[in-house]
Each structure stands twice: as C-alpha cells, then as structure tokens.
Amino acid sequence: MKTLIFTLSSLQLIFLPQLSLGNYLLDEILHLSDVDQQQLSAVTRITNASNYFGFDLYNTLKGSGNVLISPYSLSCAMAMVYLGSRGVTEREMHSVLNYGSFGLTRDDVRLGFQQAINTLTSNTIGYTLDTANALLIQRSFEVQEDFRQKIETDFGAEVREVDFQSQTTIVQQAINTWTAHKTQNNIQNILKEPPDSNTLLFFLNAVYFKGFWETTFDPKQSTIMKFYNNGSVSTDTVMMMMESRLPFGYVESLNCLALEMPYQGRNVTMLLLLPVSPNGLPELEQALSPASISLIYSTLRKRRVKVFIPKFKLEEEYEEVLKEGLSDMGMKSLFGFNANLNGITEDTGLYVTTVVHKTSIEVDEEGTVASAASGVGGGWRSATPRFMANHPFLFFIRHSETGAVLFMGRVSQL
C-alpha cells in the first residue's frame, strides 16, 4: 500500500511596512482578543513549531544552489498525517514537527491549524492568500469517520474517494481542476503527471500568495548589474532600485545586513538577510535560528536606505531529498512497512512512499519574493546606507498575525 503526500507552495509577489518575525508581540496577541485563550495558545505554539520545523528542514536541504520552502504549507500537510498516526510513528512525528518542544497535544494541533487557516485567509487587504487542502483516498480503502470529520472541520480539507488504480488520468485532471478553482486559477496544472496507480492516500496542501509592496520600485530605474553566483562567479541580471524609509540594520553577531520590506495592509512582510561578505552565506546559515530572528528585529530602525534587488524567478521541487531529510530528522517509520497510521484506517500495511514539495517565486518591479544585498562600494555606515543584493542572501515571508513563516529560502545563483 502506498501513501502520497504532495504539498505545493506557489508564490508570486508584486512590489508595494513594518512587522516582526519570530515570537508573538503583545499587540499581535491583543489583536486576536476575539479568539478563545486556549485556541490562541494553540495557534501561537503551532506556528512556532512550524517555524522551527522549517529551520530544521532547511538545514537538511540547503546544500548548494537556491532553496525555497514553505514551512507553513509542509507543516499543514504533515499535520494531517500526524493526526492519523499512532504508536512509534506518532511519537516520531510529534518530535520532528516540534510539537513536543512547544507542549502541543493532538487537540492543540487541530485547534492551532484551524485558527491559523481561518486567520491566514481572512482580512487579506492588499494581498491574496489562497490555500487548498485535500485528502484523496482509493475507493476500496475505508477511512475512519472520526479522522475524516477532523480533517474536514479543522483543516477545511475535502476528503474524496477516487480510483487511483484504473483512473489515474481522471484523478490528475480532477486534482488540477479542483486546485485551480480553490486558488482562483492562480495555481494550474499542479500535477504534471498522473499519480502512481498504487497510491492509496494523496494529501495535498497548496498555498498561493501575491503581495503588493507598500513602496514600489520604479521600472525606469531598473538596470543591468552583476550578481555574483555562489559569491564568486558574476552574471548580468536586471537590478531593481529604489530609495525609501524602511526598517534596516546591521546585525553584528551575524555580520549581515537586514532589511524589512512590508506589503500593503501591513499584515505580511519580507525579511531579507545579506551577509556582508559575498562568501559569508554558509556562516550566516550556521548561526541563524528562529530565536536569532527576534534579535535581528530588535536591531532594525526605520531609516532612508538605497535598495538594489535582482529581478528573478525561482522554481524548486523536493521529493527524494525531502523524504531523506525527514527520515534523517527522525521521521523514520512513516516511510516503511512499520508505519502505524491506524488513526486513518484500521487496515495494516499503509505507509508513506512519496513526499513532494513544490515552490515557486517571482520577483519584478511590481512584486517581490527574495532580495537582499550587501554594499560593494557602500555599506551600513554611509549617510544613506545601501542594501545591494548582488550576492547570495536569505529571505523570509511571514504573516504577522499568526506568526507563520509562509516561505523561506536562499537566492544563491541567478
């Protein structure tokens, strides 16, 4: 028996101020005063667990080249599986997903994601955020009714019986049509190929984000400049330029420049981290943690800064390397015959064979996703500091009210 988990995070950003990444701030907690305290505690802890899981996973995937993952998207898909896990499989997932570190029970996970999903998809002034959750089951496969109800109620997911064995093309078309509908046609052809005919469970989480910058780039200012791939080999790229008052700072302990780029509505922000040294990204990655992000925000001060960000598009897909990474992190039994998913079905022999995570980002004068830079010929000490994204940098896109990191990644080569 096979189980396929598929998470797609599709991101297109359009370039339009000032939020924080990391733990909740007091005003953010007060802003959620209409939420039951138990639910508030759960959503706070579930987003923290998701963010820490994202950092842990990033460290297993970073290798070389570009990286782009959605901690929220993948955590959401894995949480649906977790709710159906039992025994050793449950304990392993509980640990790897950082639920234990934040004292999250099974009910906390349900309540946390339920509230996070509701908050993420409401009050989206100035940006678009569409999510889609689904669980497709082989028709001959009986799902526990209690599990079905929790997935539908808490994750807003649709649970459907399909025939993977003889109607894979029809299933592919149905998934693509459904996802396009749920994301207002922003995500199309999510499956390029039909699912494996041996698939019994198909978990899908899709996220689409499109944000407008509060302060826009002028396309007339864009020019061809050098970007140093992997910190050394130069290539010509279109560099967008602007001068504006933005949260900016130098983080001495990390030897990097930090810039915060807000979107309209002030509920989503991008944090860019640029090593001062063109070859300093490995050291920055090694020193960085969710806790250090809070330190970074404490160093930011709103000031006039010259910003240079490359225009680019990233598309990444993780399959075997993701499965290996999760296994190395301690999620071992889930991917073998010893998996215990009795919360999904009473049948034995069900395990996960494939985990797929697809992400995409597009950056242009109207939108952004990843940009960072360190000034060659300029820096944080000048009268008007420069943030010159002409060598590898990191970025984080985060929803302030829930604290969820929607996307995080690295631009290493263009």
From Swiss-Prot:
GO biological process: negative regulation of serine-type endopeptidase activity
Domain of life: Eukaryota
PROSITE patterns assigned: SERPIN
Signal peptide positions on this chain: 1-22
InterPro entries in UniProt: Serpin_CS, Serpin_dom, Serpin_fam, Serpin_sf, Serpin_sf_1, Serpin_sf_2
Molecular function as annotated in GO: serine-type endopeptidase inhibitor activity
Glycosylation sites noted in the Swiss-Prot or TrEMBL record: N48, N230, N267
Residues annotated as site: Reactive bond: R381, S382
Keyword Zinc-finger: no
Record bears the keyword Signal: yes
Function text: Serine protease inhibitor that inhibits clotting factor G and to a lesser extent proclotting enzyme and clotting factor C.
Subunit structure: Monomer. Forms a covalent heterodimer with clotting factor G subunit beta chain B.
Similarity remark: Belongs to the serpin family.
Protein name, entry field: Intracellular coagulation inhibitor 3
Natural source organism: Tachypleus tridentatus (Japanese horseshoe crab)
Lineage: Eukaryota, Metazoa, Ecdysozoa, Arthropoda, Chelicerata
